[in-house]
Amino acid sequence: MARIAGVNIPNHQHAEIALTAIYGIGRARAREICEAAGINVSTKMKDVTDAEMDKLRDNVAKFVVEGDLRREVSMNIKRLMDLGCYRGLRHRRGLPVRGQRTRTNARTRKGPRKAVRASSAKAGR
């Protein structure tokens, strides 16, 4: 297995698919990187030579990927939360940020249901 940007790249996959194992690289960017390195996208990673692998590493290094990208995304979210804007408040409360309904659905973001207690229901009457 080759390592690019600190990630083990699977040998049995085509170059285009294998590069998507790196956080921040999707199919389109993987295809772009392969073309820049002069590698056919359907070439299996085990068939890529060392010189071609170096070209791949150089091309991947031009983009913000893995730890740097994760840090950048988390800092953007933290900035929104510090500003106190609507999106930041939604992040802080653990609710959907992009306008989805919350009366029903949104279970992934809200977490498991909280059971209604019988004693608190009687106290509310």
Curated annotation (Swiss-Prot):
**Gene Ontology cellular component list:** cytosol; small ribosomal subunit
Taken from the record, one Pfam family name reads Ribosomal_S13
Gene Ontology BP, a term: translation
**InterPro entries per the record?**
Rbsml_uS13_C, Ribosomal_uS13, Ribosomal_uS13-like_H2TH, Ribosomal_uS13_bac-type, Ribosomal_uS13_CS
- Supply the SUPFAM superfamilies for this chain: S13-like H2TH domain
Read off the lineage from the record. Bacteria, Pseudomonadati, Pseudomonadota, Betaproteobacteria, Nitrosomonadales
Region Disordered: list its residue ranges.
Answer: 94-125
Cite the PROSITE patterns for this sequence. RIBOSOMAL_S13_1 (PS00646), RIBOSOMAL_S13_2 (PS50159)
Gene encoding this chain? rpsM
The UniProt regions of compositional bias labelled Basic residues, in chain numbering, are 94-116
Q: Which family does it belong to?
A: Belongs to the universal ribosomal protein uS13 family.
**What GO molecular functions are on record for this protein?**
rRNA binding; structural constituent of ribosome; tRNA binding
Protein name in UniProt: Small ribosomal subunit protein uS13
Ribonucleoprotein in keyword set: yes
Instruction: Give the record's keywords alphabetically.
Output: Ribonucleoprotein, Ribosomal protein, RNA-binding, rRNA-binding, tRNA-binding
PANTHER family, per this entry? Answer: 30S RIBOSOMAL PROTEIN S13/40S RIBOSOMAL PROTEIN S18 (PTHR10871), SMALL RIBOSOMAL SUBUNIT PROTEIN US13M (PTHR10871:SF1)
Q: Does the keyword Lyase apply?
A: no
Q: What does this protein's UniProt record list under function?
A: Located at the top of the head of the 30S subunit, it contacts several helices of the 16S rRNA. In the 70S ribosome it contacts the 23S rRNA (bridge B1a) and protein L5 of the 50S subunit (bridge B1b), connecting the 2 subunits; these bridges are implicated in subunit movement. Contacts the tRNAs in the A and P-sites.
